[in-house]
């Protein structure tokens, strides 16, 4: 019994010791305590992890859950993004991409992980700061990814200490100076320095590093190597991307000796010289991009070539040498000066899938129906050429068909209804007439994007089946109502029916489409109210709505915008780098329907947006008959960039909540019946570049700021009694309007002068009375004390 009690007390003693000791962590594995402490110190270096959740979305819109540094605690299970060595327990890998980390310190705890082998800090917010030299202390590193961070300055020389490095990615930053010294990093297999501001000559050793497989120097300010290249027969370089630099035609001679190259991109070099490309010197090539240069091609091409881009090369003849390229499946000769017929040989290439012939002067397709119908082509772009007449026969397996900006006539051919799968059909900007074939919208066809704008199509819109992502039938002569079957298109993102004769009420039922981002109903015959007590209008994904130039009427409840979509309501957070989307001629595959083209009224002008940025937001209710007050809830739309409520009958005052729209760039309230003062808080809208409040009933002083007061006089003309810049009317007293600050400053001395006299009167009055009384007393009684003091 005594022994049991002894064991019990001893156990309790040790339990108390270990429980009360705050230096001991409960870990399921024997990780060194110092590693856990360093991890927690690293976490505390980044106090805020609040950022726009869209920053964590991958290319496909899925949430990136690889790591979450904000969840790190003493519990080792919480260290997502961290890998420990199974034998020693030290941290060997950190994957902290897309964590909204900021301000990487020069003495960061990060540089204490001496055994770290893999480090990913990509897509964070280290903007406008240099790369710390401390990275050079991580001598065990094998892979370092610092891409998409906004680092500036030169790469520290300490990077040359990383002798075990096999992968180095510094792309999409703002790094300057020459290419860093990587000569001693002989184990490198992949180097990506693209999308920076590196300048000077390319070091010749880069082409002959013993294990280097891929070298990406795209979009810098680099020029030809100055030194001769000492070629190695064992060079393993396979992929070379030097697009968007300052290379001359002379670069072809040295790189032609790299016998194993399979992919070369020399597109868009800023040189006046012609690239004389000899295929005989590049027998292993699989992919070649010479776009954006003046090119002369010699030889028949590599038998392994699968990808050829000669777009924007100023060529005048079809490249007939492709007839021998039996493995070629991707051809782009767009934006050249080629005329006449598309040769028959194009349809006979057995592997051909993608063909872009746009922006030339082709006028017809050569080849018999039998030959064309045997072609394997699945993506065909004939847009912006000189085709005319009826639409030609096309290969049977085409699933992406673009033929916009031509002169095609007649009805839309029914051959499209016989395609096995047609994802995209773009026949916009032609002279097609008649009705839209019902079969085009059958679910069995699988159409995802239908672009028929700027034709002469008539009749009603057919019922639309599911799967459609983009529908653009703007600027035709379509009548009737919007088909209610659109509510079944759960994938619809873009709807444009502008410039037709559609006669319908507001489509409240569209709010059921949870992915709908853009609605354009402009210039039709829509009518009636756009609010209803029975239906609360809430679009979950809407960011652009244009219902201008219709006959909508009624008033908008004060809470009208209270339940609108997250893209309009949420304030953008964090940083976005426009250059991350690639250059204008990026070759990354992107769905064609990602770039709908619409006309929007921005800053008083109609502007065509060919590629609408994902963060662009706009509301245009202009040219209707809305009345009543502008809802105060408009201030809830904190991400709004363009607001146009002009040419209506709105009354009441301008809501002060407009000052909450910190992203607003364009505001048009002209041609209404709005009264009262312009809210002075609008001075705080620092992005506001266009303001129009003309032809209302506004009074008082125009807010004096660059954004508002700096507008042209026409932006405020036609009001009752506005004053202040940019108008000539000054805000003097007596005009029934408040004083301007300048006038107030002039009047201030007068007011102070009057106040000073009043104060003097108040002070002098009692003093004078008191003096008279004392004087009388002196005169009558002559007190002895006063005589003694003043010797009177």
UniProtKB/Swiss-Prot annotation:
Leader sequence segment: 1-21
Placement of LRR repeats on the sequence: 114-137, 139-162, 163-187, 189-209, 211-233, 235-258, 259-282, 283-302, 303-324, 325-349, 351-374, 375-399, 400-418, 419-443, 444-470, 472-489, 490-515, 516-536, 539-563, 614-637, 638-661, 662-685, 687-709
Gene3D superfamilies registered for this protein in UniProt: Ribonuclease Inhibitor
SMART domains tied to this protein: LRR_SD22, LRR_TYP
Extracellular side: 22-758
Family matches, as InterPro entries: Leu-rich_rpt, Leu-rich_rpt_typical-subtyp, LRR_dom_sf, LRR_R13L4/SHOC2-like, RLP23-like
Record topological domains on the Cytoplasmic side: 780-792
Known glycosylation sites: 68, 107, 161, 230, 304, 314, 356, 374, 431, 442, 454, 488, 503, 553, 563, 647, 692
Topology versus the membrane: Single-pass type I membrane protein
PROSITE patterns: LRR
Pfam families (UniProt xref): LRR_1, LRR_14, LRR_6, LRR_8
Record's keyword terms, sorted: Cell membrane, Glycoprotein, Leucine-rich repeat, Membrane, Receptor, Repeat, Signal, Transmembrane, Transmembrane helix
Membrane spanning stretches: 759-779
Family: Belongs to the RLP family.
UniProt-recorded name of the protein: Receptor-like protein 54
Species in which this protein is naturally found: Arabidopsis thaliana (Mouse-ear cress)
Classification lineage: Eukaryota, Viridiplantae, Streptophyta, Embryophyta, Tracheophyta
Gene name in the database record: RLP54
């Amino acid at each position: 019994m005594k022994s049991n009690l002894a064991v019990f007390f001893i156990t309790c003693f040790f339990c108390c010791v270990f429980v009360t000791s705050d230096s001991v962590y409960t870990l399921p594995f024997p990780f060194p305590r110092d590693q856990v402490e360093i991890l927690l110190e690293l976490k505390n270096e980044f106090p805020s992890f609040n950022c726009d959740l869209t920053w964590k979305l991958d290319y496909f819109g899925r949430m990136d859950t690889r790591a979450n540094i904000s969840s790190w605690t003493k519990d080792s299970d919480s260290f997502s993004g961290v890998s420990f060595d199974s034998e020693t327990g030290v941290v060997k890998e950190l994957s902290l991409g897309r964590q909204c980390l900021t301000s990487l310190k020069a003495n960061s705890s990060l540089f204490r992980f001496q055994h770290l082998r893999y480090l990913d800090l990509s897509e964070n917010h280290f903007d406008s700061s240099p790369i710390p030299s401390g990275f050079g202390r991580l001598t065990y590193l094998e892979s370092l990814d610092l891409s998409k961070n906004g680092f500036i300055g030169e790469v520290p020389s300490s990077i040359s200490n990383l002798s075990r490095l096999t992968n180095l990615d510094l792309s999409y930053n703002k790094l300057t100076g020459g290419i860093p010294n990587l000569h001693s990093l002989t184990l490198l297999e992949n180097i990506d320095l693209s999308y920076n501001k590196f300048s000077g000559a390319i070091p010749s050793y880069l082409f002959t590093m013993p294990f280097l497989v891929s070298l990406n120097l795209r979009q810098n300010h680099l020029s030809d190597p100055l030194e001769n290249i000492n070629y190695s027969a064992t060079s393993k370089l396979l992929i070379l991307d030097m697009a968007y630099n300052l290379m001359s035609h002379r670069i072809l001679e040295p790189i032609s000796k790299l016998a194993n190259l399979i992919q070369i991109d020399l597109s868009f070099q800023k040189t006046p010289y012609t690239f004389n490309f000899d295929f005989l010197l590049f027998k292993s090539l699989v992919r070649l991009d010479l776009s954006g240069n003046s090119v002369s091609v010699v030889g028949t091409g590599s038998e392994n070539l699968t990808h050829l881009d000669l777009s924007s090369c100023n060529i005048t003849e079809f490249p007939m040498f492709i007839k021998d390229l039996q493995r070629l499946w991707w051809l782009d000769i767009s934006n050249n000066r080629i005329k006449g017929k598309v040769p028959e040989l194009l349809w006979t290439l057995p592997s051909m899938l993608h063909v872009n012939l746009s922006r030339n002067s082709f006028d017809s397709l050569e080849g018999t129906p039998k030959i064309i119908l045997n072609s394997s082509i699945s993506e065909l772009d004939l847009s912006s050429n000189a085709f005319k007449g009826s639409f030609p026969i096309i290969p049977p397996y085409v699933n992406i068909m673009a033929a916009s900006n031509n002169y095609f006539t007649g009805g839309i051919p029914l051959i499209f209804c016989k395609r096995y799968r047609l994802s995209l059909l773009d026949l916009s900007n032609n002279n097609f007439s008649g009705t839209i074939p019902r079969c085009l919208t059958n679910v069995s066809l699988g159409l995802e994007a239908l672009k028929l704008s700027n034709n002469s199509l008539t009749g009603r819109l057919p019922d639309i089946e599911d799967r459609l992502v983009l529908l653009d039938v703007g600027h035709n002569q379509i009548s009737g109502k919007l088909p209610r079957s659109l509510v079944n298109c759960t994938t619809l993102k873009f709807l444009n029916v502008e410039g037709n004769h559609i006669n319908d009420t507001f489509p409240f039922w569209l709010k059921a489409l949870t992915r709908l981002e853009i609605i354009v109903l402009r210039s039709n015959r829509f009518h009636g109210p756009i609010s209803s007590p029975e239906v609360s209008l809430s679009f979950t994904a809407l960011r652009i709505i244009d219902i201008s130039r219709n006959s909508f009427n009624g008033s908008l409840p004060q809470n009208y915008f209270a339940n609108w979509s997250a893209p309009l309501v949420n304030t953008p957070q964090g940083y976005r780098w426009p250059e991350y989307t690639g250059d204008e001629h990026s070759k990354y595959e992107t769905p064609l329907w990602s770039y709908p083209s619409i006309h929007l009224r921005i800053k008083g002008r109609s502007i065509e947006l060919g590629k609408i940025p994902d963060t662009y937001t706009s509301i245009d209710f202009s040219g209707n008959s809305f009345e009543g007050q502008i809802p105060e809830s408009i201030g809830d739309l904190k991400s709004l960039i363009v607001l146009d409520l002009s040419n209506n009958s709105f009354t009441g005052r301008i809501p002060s909540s407009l000052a909450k729209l910190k992203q607003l760039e364009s505001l048009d309230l002209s041609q209404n019946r709005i009264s009262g003062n312009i809210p002075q808080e609008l001075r705080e809208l620092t992005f506001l570049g266009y303001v129009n409040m003309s032809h209302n009933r506004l009074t008082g002083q125009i807010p004096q700021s660059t954004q508002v007061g700096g507008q042209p006089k026409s932006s405020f003309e036609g009001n009752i009694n506005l004053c202040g810049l940019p108008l000539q009317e000054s805000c003097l007293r007596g005009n029934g309007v408040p004083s301007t600050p300048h006038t107030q400053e002039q009047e201030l001395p007068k007011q102070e002068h009057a106040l000073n006299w009043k104060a003097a009167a108040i002070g002098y009055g009692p003093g004078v009375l008191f003096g008279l009384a004392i004087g009388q007393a002196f005169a009558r009684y002559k007190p002895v004390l006063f005589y003694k003091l003043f010797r009177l």
